[in-house]
């Protein structure tokens, strides 16, 4: 009888331990994409300090690619650089503060040195051309497919329990 109680107790302890590992296994820091209008979660991607992500799109006026690059620092999202290929309305033409301009081998203009926290990072998903999220491992996610055309998408960096 005593053996049976001990075995039952150990079995329950192992089951409880497995349940805790499963429940806590998905907790951590995530890049979270939500509807800025409804709060609906579109997606979440695990990230840690020092990880990068970018959002690419085709500029609506000059019809060339633009890539905004962000880094996770101090548990926040920081814009670090922008890559673009043509000047046009809404494209930076002057450098400020510690910003620098360099050129890529493909002719890209790279403005870096922003190092600016983005407390409210929101994108409007294009109707004519898509916006693409690129996360750590190079995975490309179509924001049009994930969120829908004309969606207003808010990016946050959050601790999530599950």
Where are these regions (language model features)?
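Hydrophobic membrane-insertion alpha-helices, especially the h-region
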Residues: 7-24
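Short, surface-exposed beta-strand-loop junctions and turns on beta-sheet-rich folds
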Residues: 61-62, 85-87, 117-118
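Positively charged n-region of N-terminal signal peptides that target proteins for export
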Residues: 1-4
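Hydrophobic alpha-helical targeting segments used for export or membrane insertion
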Residues: 10, 14, 31-32, 36
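Aromatic-capped interface at the extracytoplasmic side
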Residues: 20-35
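Exposed beta-strand and adjacent loop surfaces of beta-rich binding modules
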Residues: 28-30, 52, 67, 130, ...
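Mature, soluble, non-transmembrane domains
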Residues: 80-81, 90-162
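N-terminal secretory signal peptides
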Residues: 34-83
């Amino acid at each position: 009888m005593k053996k049976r109680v001990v075995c039952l107790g150990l079995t329950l302890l192992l089951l409880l331990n497995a349940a805790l590992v499963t429940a806590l296994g998905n907790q951590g820091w995530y890049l979270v994409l939500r509807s800025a209008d409804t709060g609906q979660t579109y997606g979440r991607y695990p990230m840690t300090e020092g990880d990068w992500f970018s959002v690419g799109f085709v500029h609506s006026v000059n019809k060339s690619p633009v890539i905004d690059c962000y880094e996770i620092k101090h548990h926040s999202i920081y814009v670090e650089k922008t890559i673009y290929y043509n000047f046009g309305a809404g494209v930076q033409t002057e450098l400020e503060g510690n910003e620098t301009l360099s050129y890529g081998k493909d002719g890209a203009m790279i403005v870096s040195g922003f190092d600016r926290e983005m407390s409210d990072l929101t994108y409007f998903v294009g109707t004519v051309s898509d916006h693409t999220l690129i996360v750590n491992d190079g995975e490309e996610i179509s924001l049009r497919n994930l969120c829908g055309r004309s969606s207003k998408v808010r990016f946050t960096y959050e601790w999530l329990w599950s």
